[in-house]
C-alpha cells in the first residue's frame, strides 16, 4: 500500500533515485545568520531551476543534498534547527531545543515537529522540488502563498478557529513556524474498507469552513497576491493533462493489473477528453475567480484534533471558483465510500447559504476521481480493478453526463 497522496514514479525516473541512493550523502547545510525578515516583507526570489534532486526522500535522512549552498535547508538535526531559531530570534528566553522529528509523511514539503524545553511547534519549509520525490521540480515560493493565506485568515471572522496559528515566517528561507496540533490525525484512513466514514458533525464542519472562507474572502484586491499561477499550473498538469496523456510513462498495471487497459479506454473517449481539457482551461483562467479557495481540499488536508476539524496545507490556494473546493471534497467522499445522500446533504448545506453551480461541481469531481486513479498522485487505497472500474465509470458519468461502457466491458 502506498502512503497518503503518494506519487507514482514514471518509467525512467527510477534510475535517478537509484543513482542518488549510491551517492555519498553530502552535508551542505549552512546555518543562516542575520535577523528574521518581517512577515509583511515579500522579497524578490530568484527563479527555480527546472529539475532538482535531493536524497531526502530516502527515509528522511538528516543530511540532504543542497544544490543551493547560499540557502538554509531544514533537517531534523538539533544544531541545524537551533541555529535557525536563534538567528531568527524565534526562541523564548531560556528556551532550548530538545527533540526534532518528521511530522507525518509530507509529500510536498519538509515538515518537522520541534520540541523545546517550553513547547512544541511545527517547522514547514518548501524547497524547489517535491519532498517525497525530488526528481519532480515544484514552485519554490509556495510557502509565501501559504503564509499569505494564514495572514489573511486572521482578518476573516470565524476562519482562524479551523486553522493552526502561524507563529512566525521567514520568507527568505520559505519557512513557516506553525502551531503544533498535538495528537492530531488526518483522514486518509477514510479510504479503508473498515472505515466508518465521516460523522455528520465532521462533514458539517468541513462544509462550514468552506462557507466561511468563500463568503468572506471575495475582495478584488486578493486576486493578485493569490494568483498562485505556478502552483495552479503544476496542479493543472497533474490533474487535467498527465493522466490522459498516453505517453506519460506511468505503469498503471504495476499498481493494479488491468488498470492500464481501463485507462486507455478512457483516454480514447474523445468527448470525455475534450470535456476534461475544457474544464482544465476553466481551472487555469484567472478571470474565472470569485473568491479565495483552499485549492487542495481532500482528506490529507483535514485534521482531527482537540475534538474538532482543522484544515492545513493551503499552499495550493488561489483566487478561484468555490466549486473547485466543493468538487474535491465530493470526489473524496465518493472514493471513501460515503453515500450519495451524504454527499448531497453536504452540498445542500453549502447551497443553503451560497449559490454554486452543481453541474460544475460534478464535472470537477469526476476529473479528480479520474486523476487519483490513473494519474501520478495515487491515494493510499487497496481498491481492486472492479472498484476502480466503478469509480472511473462514475468519473465519466459526472464529467460528460452519460453512463460509461467501461463497466459493461470489465464487469459483465
For the regions a language model picked out, list residue spans one by one.
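Helical subdomain adjoining the active site within ATP-dependent kinase catalytic cores
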Residues: 358-363, 368-412
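Conserved kinase catalytic-core helix
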Residues: 187-227
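Active-site catalytic-loop/activation-segment of kinase and kinase-like phosphoryl-transfer enzymes
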Residues: 60-78, 225-281, 374
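Conserved NTP-binding catalytic cores of kinases and kinase-like/nucleotidyltransferase enzymes
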Residues: 15, 51-172, 306, 401-412
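Active-site activation/catalytic loop segments of kinase-like enzymes and analogous catalytic loops
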Residues: 148, 322-353, 365-384
Amino acid at each position: 500500500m502506498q502512503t497518503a497522496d503518494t506519487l507514482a514514479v514514471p518509467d525512467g525516473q527510477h534510475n535517478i533515485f537509484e543513482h542518488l541512493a549510491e551517492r555519498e550523502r553530502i552535508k551542505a547545510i549552512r546555518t543562516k545568520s542575520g535577523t528574521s525578515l518581517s512577515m509583511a516583507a515579500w522579497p524578490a526570489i530568484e527563479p527555480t531551476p527546472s529539475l532538482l534532486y535531493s536524497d531526502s526522500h530516502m527515509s528522511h535522512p538528516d543530511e540532504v543534498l543542497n544544490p543551493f549552498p547560499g540557502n538554509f535547508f531544514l533537517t531534523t538535526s538539533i544544531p541545524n534547527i537551533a541555529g535557525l531559531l536563534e538567528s531568527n530570534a524565534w526562541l523564548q528566553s531560556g528556551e532550548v531545543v530538545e527533540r526534532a522529528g518528521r511530522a507525518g509523511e509530507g509529500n510536498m514539503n519538509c515538515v518537522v515537529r520541534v520540541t523545546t524545553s517550553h513547547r512544541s511547534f511545527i517547522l514547514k519549509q518548501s524547497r524547489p522540488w517535491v519532498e517525497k520525490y525530488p526528481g519532480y521540480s515544484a514552485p519554490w515560493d509556495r510557502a509565501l502563498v501559504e503564509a499569505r493565506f494564514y495572514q489573511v485568515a486572521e482578518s476573516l471572522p470565524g476562519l482562524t478557529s479551523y486553522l493552526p496559528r502561524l507563529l512566525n515566517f521567514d520568507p527568505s528561507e520559505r519557512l513557516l513556524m506553525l502551531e503544533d496540533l498535538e495528537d492530531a490525525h488526518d483522514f486518509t484512513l477514510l479510504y479503508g474498507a473498515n472505515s466508518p466514514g465521516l460523522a455528520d458533525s465532521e462533514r458539517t464542519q468541513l462544509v462550514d469552513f468552506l462557507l466561511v472562507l468563500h463568503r468572506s474572502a471575495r475582495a478584488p484586491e486578493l486576486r493578485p497576491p493569490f494568483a498562485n499561477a505556478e502552483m495552479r499550473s503544476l496542479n493543472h498538469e497533474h490533474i487535467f493533462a498527465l493522466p490522459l496523456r498516453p505517453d506519460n510513462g506511468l505503469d498503471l498495471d504495476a499498481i493494479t493489473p488491468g488498470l492500464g487497459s481501463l485507462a486507455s479506454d478512457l483516454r480514447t473517449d474523445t468527448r470525455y477528453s475534450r470535456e476534461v481539457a475544457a474544464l482544465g482551461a476553466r481551472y487555469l483562467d484567472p478571470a474565472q475567480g470569485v473568491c479565495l479557495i483552499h485549492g487542495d481540499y481532500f482528506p490529507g488536508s483535514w485534521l482531527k484534533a482537540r475534538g474538532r476539524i482543522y484544515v492545513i496545507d493551503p499552499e495550493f490556494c488561489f483566487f478561484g471558483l468555490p466549486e473547485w473546493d466543493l468538487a474535491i471534497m465530493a470526489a473524496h467522499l465518493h472514493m471513501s465510500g460515503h453515500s450519495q445522500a451524504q454527499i448531497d446533504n453536504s452540498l445542500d448545506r453549502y447551497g443553503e447559504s451560497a449559490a454554486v453551480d452543481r453541474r460544475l461541481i460534478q464535472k470537477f469531481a469526476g476529473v479528480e476521481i479520474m486523476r487519483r486513479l490513473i494519474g501520478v498522485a495515487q491515494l493510499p487505497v487497496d481498491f481492486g480493478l472492479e472498484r476502480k472500474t466503478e469509480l472511473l465509470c462514475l468519473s465519466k458519468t459526472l464529467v460528460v453526463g452519460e453512463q460509461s461502457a467501461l463497466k459493461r466491458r470489465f464487469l459483465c
